């Protein structure tokens, strides 16, 4: 007879993890989930094993609002190895072509300019996008290439940092859906020498503060210290979390009086003052502005519930 599954904690919020190199996003997600003993956890946009940096991990009810971070802008620092092209467009892949690096500074500046602004990008075969229900990297590992449509992306800023020998360092501020590996691969082809990513760090996601990032090692140290001092680890871990509504921080706030919020939480649209004319809104209730979910302004100007927070007993 199987043992009953142990129930985790109903903990809600967003941890800004500084993902280490060499681990998959799912691996670090599972470690954080165990450290927090959380019932539910999910990340908001995977980083390649080679990459480091900001990986927001949503716990509990915050997972309902993680989709809003998937749509947010991101900023990266990347170092490319020039003269070598790999099958994965990064250092984890196999070298498939080597060519001399002969471009001039003017040619580099001209090539970089073509990647700024609104452009279209054909995703790498080594990505998690799906074709006929199967992830592209699964086809790639079988040596199968399938058709991919170009997707519109926006590169808000592409900063040249340095070019030394066969290394090129850039900083990229981009929209959702942008593959930095693909930018580097495409840039290498435009320069005629090939290139692949050797270092990639996600600096920021949306407007999250960089100084709130924490490492796995720090979390594990806190757990060990709490155990030594005989205090619950949650006492030190939970203050590290950002609010559960922080993934939707770009949306305007509508505050409902308690007399109206009870109807909203039961799935009914409600009328209120001071709401925008249309679009999604964060909905709070009462004088303490407690977050209760996401709403959308309907055709009659009412706030209709879209995603609601489940209230757990304390």
Curated annotation (Swiss-Prot):
It catalyses: uridine(55) in tRNA = pseudouridine(55) in tRNA. Keywords: Isomerase, tRNA processing. The keyword Cell division does not apply. It is an enzyme of class 5 (isomerase). GO terms for biological process: mRNA pseudouridine synthesis; tRNA pseudouridine synthesis. The active site is at 48 (nucleophile). Substrate binds at residues 43, 76, 179, 200. InterPro entries: PsdUridine_synth_cat_dom_sf, PsdUridine_synth_N, PUA-like_sf, PUA_sf, tRNA_psdUridine_synth_TruB, tRNA_sdUridine_synth_fam1_C, TruB_C. SUPFAM superfamilies: Pseudouridine synthase (SSF55120), PUA domain-like (SSF88697). Its EC number is 5.4.99.25. One of its GO terms (molecular function) is RNA binding. Responsible for synthesis of pseudouridine from uracil-55 in the psi GC loop of transfer RNAs. Belongs to the pseudouridine synthase TruB family. Type 1 subfamily. NCBIfam families: TruB. This is tRNA pseudouridine synthase B. It comes from Salmonella paratyphi A (strain ATCC 9150 / SARB42). The lineage of its organism: Bacteria, Pseudomonadati, Pseudomonadota, Gammaproteobacteria, Enterobacterales.
């Amino acid at each position: 007879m199987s043992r009953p599954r142990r129930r985790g904690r109903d903990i809600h919020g967003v941890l800004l993890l500084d993902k280490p190199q060499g681990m998959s996003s799912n691996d670090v997600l599972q470690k954080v989930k165990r450290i927090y003993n959380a019932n539910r956890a999910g990340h908001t946009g995977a980083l390649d094993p080679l990459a480091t940096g900001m990986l927001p991990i949503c716990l509990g009810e915050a997972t309902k609002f993680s989709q809003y971070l998937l749509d947010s802008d991101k900023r990266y620092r990347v170092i490319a190895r020039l003269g070598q092209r790999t099958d994965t467009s990064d250092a984890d892949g196999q070298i498939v072509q080597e060519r001399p690096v002969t471009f001039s500074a003017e040619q580099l500046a001209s090539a970089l300019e073509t990647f700024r602004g609104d452009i279209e990008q054909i995703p790498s075969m080594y990505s998690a996008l799906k074709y006929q229900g199967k992830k592209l990297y699964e086809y790639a590992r079988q040596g199968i290439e399938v058709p991919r449509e170009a997707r519109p992306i926006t590169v808000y800023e592409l900063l040249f940092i340095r070019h030394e020998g066969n290394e090129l360092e850039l900083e990229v501020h981009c929209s959702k859906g942008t593959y930095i590996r693909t930018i580097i691969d495409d840039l290498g082809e435009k320069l005629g020498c090939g290139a692949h990513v050797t270092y990639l760090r996600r600096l920021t996601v949306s407007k999250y503060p960089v100084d709130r990032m924490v490492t796995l090692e720090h979390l594990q140290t806190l757990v060990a210290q709490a155990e030594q001092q005989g205090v619950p680890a949650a006492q030190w871990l939970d203050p590290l979390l950002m609010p559960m509504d922080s993934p939707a921080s770009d949306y305007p706030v509508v505050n409902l009086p308690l007399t109206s919020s009870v109807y909203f939480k039961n799935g009914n649209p409600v009328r209120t003052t001071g709401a925008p004319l249309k679009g999604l809104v964060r909905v709070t209730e009462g004088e303490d502005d407690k977050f209760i979910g996401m709403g959308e302004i309907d055709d009659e100007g009412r706030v209709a519930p879209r995603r609601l927070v489940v209230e757990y007993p304390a």
